[in-house]
Amino acid sequence: MSEKKFDIYFEFNYSKINLAVFNKINDKLEYYKEQTYESYFNNYKELNFEKLEKILEESILEIEKSTKEFVRDIYLIIETPQSKSLKLSVTKNNEGNKVIKEDATYLVQDAKQQILKTNQDLGILHIIVENYVLDEIQHKFLPLNQKCIKLSIDVEFICFPKNLIKNFEKLFSKQQIFIKRFICLNYIKTLDYIDKEQNICEQGKSIVKGINKQEVVSIPRESKRKGFFERLFHFFK
């Protein structure tokens, strides 16, 4: 199978679907389309997946015609009132040792497992480390090699209901398309430093590229089978 030349982004919001195609080599926007439609029932509480399926099929054909390349995977940006922001602080006794990456990795993993255990109906889209706290002193970024007795982190988790995630996965699987990553539109809107002149798909690409240095970046599930610890090293390195 030949190497893909393009990254595809879809964005579903309350009134439109936006499509964008980016050149993988230079990140240039090669194709962009906005389409107005009504995707929700019941005052934005329930998605009309039957209507989405028809629009999606037409959109995929347009993209493949434009790029002369089959669409096999995409990045998906979604606006939904069902998104949730959960926050948690976790602590460890660092015994006066220097802070290393593994300490932060352990705490993030601990926080993640607690969130998943108590919210089994949710899937995590974004993990943001808001603060690292060393002996009651806050830091926005990991202060490596500083000594402390007490180390804690404040973490925010942006989540979608698992059934919503599964419904979108099912929708795209009918076109034999894998969703590489879900991105929450409400989360994008909270970032003051993101380029407001860009369209939503471009802003979503900035998220994927790591514009928020406090966000833990994970590897797509279908490739690079690495454990959670190893995946977090991509963030803490």
Task: List where the protein language model places each region.
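Short N-terminal binding/cap micro-motifs at the start of the first secondary-structure element
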Residues: K16-L19
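Nucleotide/phosphate-binding catalytic cleft detector across ATP-hydrolyzing
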Residues: M1-Y14, K24-E30, Q35-F70, I78-K237
